[in-house]
Amino acid sequence: MPSRPLIQLLDTTTINQIAAGEVIENSISVVKELVENALDAGADEIEVETLGGGQGLIVVKDNGCGMSAEDVTLALKRHATSKIGEFSDIFSLSSFGFRGEALPAIASISKMEILSCPRIGEGSRTIIHGGEIIASEAKPRQLGTTISIDSLFYNVPVRRGFQKSPQADRIAMRKLLENRILSIEGVGWSWVSERQQEFHILKHRGFAERVGFVMGEGFMQEALRVDSGERPVCVRGFLGSPGFHRPTRSGQRVFINDRPVDSVFISKQIREAYSMLLPPQRHPVFVLKLYLPPEWCDFNVHPQKTEVRILKEEFVGEFLSESIGEVLARPQESSVSEKTIFSLPALRFFDEHLAERSSVEPLESISLPELSIPPKVPLPFLDKGQDIPTTDGQMQIDWGVSQEVRFLTSLGKIVLAEDSEGVHAIFTEAARKHLFYLALTENQQYNYKSQSFLVPLCLEVTPQEGIFLSSHVEDFKQLGIELSQMGPCIFAIDSAPTFIGEEELKSWILFLAAESHAKVDRKAVALLIKETLTQTVFCKTLRPFDISWLSLLWQIGKPEKAFDGTQIRRLVLDEDFIKE
């Protein structure tokens, strides 16, 4: 009996599922491929609907050229495409797709329905499960194609187990669609998520209006227009003013030949053009469309085509640096006319609701659940407390809070205390900060005052940051910060604790949203909120150290290190330390 060959030919379904592992990572990859197919089909109206961040349902509807039933069958075969005829066509691509892998790959890991009608001929409906066509029939439809994806990864449970949360996919989905809004003008876009309209952009909206929608009015009010060079090498777009910057590169949108790309090279060139205009570790915000000869660009680096190799990188770098440098050297006034900006409803919406919100009664002080620490001890920095009288630079206090530890003296920012183990040096700044952080994270039963603003503070954020803030409203509320969403990108701060100023509060929330909007671990984000709030409060605040807080340190185990690694306590073993 002949033995079975070691080398086996894979069946078509397995081949497509393997290809899907490279092309289709998640629901965002599916939508990306489907909307690119719609654009390549000449559509100027594209509608997207998702449920569960796309993990439950994806529907992409377009008014492109459509397909006959025969074309649909061919399109489901691997490496069947209408976009190239031979390999050399790859180096002069004008379409977004060309491999002919995406549709069969998606079909192999989902339950798919394709409803399509060409310009000449009748419409058809094709149902595919796991890559196999199970039904095909004539079905009326207007010109165009509708593709519905249900049960993504239903037959690849391992892949399904690695999917992120629906909330994370929703945030990434929005960025994907925003990039398409910016990259291609003359196309109308609609997105319905969780059965609610997220946006509807009319196709006649110009580039400046689209940038205003995606980046917000705050960006556009001081944006600097870039329009340098002529085809085939040119750059156009908008730069944020040097005063408009972020802690990460999340506010940067780069397009090369209308393809959204993530280019560290281009970001670095533009950051260097800003040079000393930005504070350290801050990044400029911009939307730039760079056009280069097709033969200079290789988008075939990765199946998702978000990376690009540039043939004449040095020339392109110099061109960008000079173009951006010239714009930044101009008198810094916004080069965008107010008339060119898409009239966003956000601020008007905020004004309409201001009257009904301005009469909010002051909130009761916020209570946090109990730990066994004497309630008479004030929480560090929640309350200024009483200044401790000093004589010759040393604190004089009637110590009686704890029998475990005894206050000795104060040496500037260091307090010396003694217990059965010996003499301890307490670094007061780190101790105060750590106790404050514990008060937030451990939910101790202490009250601190929360103030309600007569006129709520207004925050404008990006849509992705808006999704992040709206999903963590309860985490802010636990800290006495009341956030109300007034629109996709507008939030009102109704109340906040008295231990943080208004400008510090706004800056902290904006920083947090920009830094953390892509994070999905709710517990980690909740801790990050408290940690960054602690750092913000202590960065600006210098208040006297209450000696009674020593008792708290001992009751929590007299820690040596604070939550951020700074030293709180050190055992004094010799006189050299005191001299330091």
UniProtKB/Swiss-Prot annotation:
CDD domains: HATPase_MutL-MLH-PMS-like, MutL_Trans. The keyword Cytoplasm does not apply. Transmembrane segments: none annotated. Keywords: DNA damage, DNA repair. InterPro entries: DNA_mismatch_repair_CS, DNA_mismatch_repair_MutL, DNA_mismatch_S5_2-like, HATPase_C_sf, MutL/Mlh/PMS, MutL/Mlh/Pms-like, MutL_C, MutL_C_dimsub. Pfam families: DNA_mis_repair, HATPase_c_3, MutL_C. One of its GO terms (cellular component) is mismatch repair complex. GO terms for molecular function: ATP binding; ATP hydrolysis activity; ATP-dependent DNA damage sensor activity; mismatched DNA binding. GO terms for biological process: mismatch repair. Belongs to the DNA mismatch repair MutL/HexB family. This protein is involved in the repair of mismatches in DNA. It is required for dam-dependent methyl-directed DNA mismatch repair. May act as a 'molecular matchmaker', a protein that promotes the formation of a stable complex between two or more DNA-binding proteins in an ATP-dependent manner without itself being part of a final effector complex. This is DNA mismatch repair protein MutL. It comes from Chlamydia felis (strain Fe/C-56). The lineage of its organism: Bacteria, Pseudomonadati, Chlamydiota, Chlamydiia, Chlamydiales.
